[in-house]
C-alpha cells in the first residue's frame, strides 16, 4: 500500500464529515474519527486514550463511538462508550471492522471509513434511535494526532 503524508485530502475529509452528520440523523449516538500515522501502543489502548482526550465519554447517554486509524502502521480500532458496551455483545464491532479492513486492503480508505460510519450508525440505531430534539454533542470533524 502506498501512503501519503496525510491520509485524506480536504475533499475526502469533507465527505467523511458529511457522512458522520448524515449517520447521526439515524441515532442519538455520536461518531468521531481520529487519524494519525503511528500507534506506539496497543491499538485499543491508544484508541481509548484518544477517546478520553476527545471527551467522548461526556455524552448524555455515554453512546459515543470512535473510529481510530493509525494508517502508516496499518492498524485501526472501533470503540464505544459505556452506554453502548453495557447493552451490546463483546463482538459488536467485529463485522464492521472486518468490512472496513476489506476496503483498506484495496487502498480505499475514505470508502472504508464511510462504510464504518454508516454501519456504526445502523447498529447503534437499534439501541439508541435518533430522537426529536437530539443535539449534536460532539464535533463531527476528523481529529488528527
Explain the meaning of each model-derived region.
Residues 1-145:
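A structural boundary signal for the start of the first folded domain, especially the loop/turn
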Amino acid at each position: 500500500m502506498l501512503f501519503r503524508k496525510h491520509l485524506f485530502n480536504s475533499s475526502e475529509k469533507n465527505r467523511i464529515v458529511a457522512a458522520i452528520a448524515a449517520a447521526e440523523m439515524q441515532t442519538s449516538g455520536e461518531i468521531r474519527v481520529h487519524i494519525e500515522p503511528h500507534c506506539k501502543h496497543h491499538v485499543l489502548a491508544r484508541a481509548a486514550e484518544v477517546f478520553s482526550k476527545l471527551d467522548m465519554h461526556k455524552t448524555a447517554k455515554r453512546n459515543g463511538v470512535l473510529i481510530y486509524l493509525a494508517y502508516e502502521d496499518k492498524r485501526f480500532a472501533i470503540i464505544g462508550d459505556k452506554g453502548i458496551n453495557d447493552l451490546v455483545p463483546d463482538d459488536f464491532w467485529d463485522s464492521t471492522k472486518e468490512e472496513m479492513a476489506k476496503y483498506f486492503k484495496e487502498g480505499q480508505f475514505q470508502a472504508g471509513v464511510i462504510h464504518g460510519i454508516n454501519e456504526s450508525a445502523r447498529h447503534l440505531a437499534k439501541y439508541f434511535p435518533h430522537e426529536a430534539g437530539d443535539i449534536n454533542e460532539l464535533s463531527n470533524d476528523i481529529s488528527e494526532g
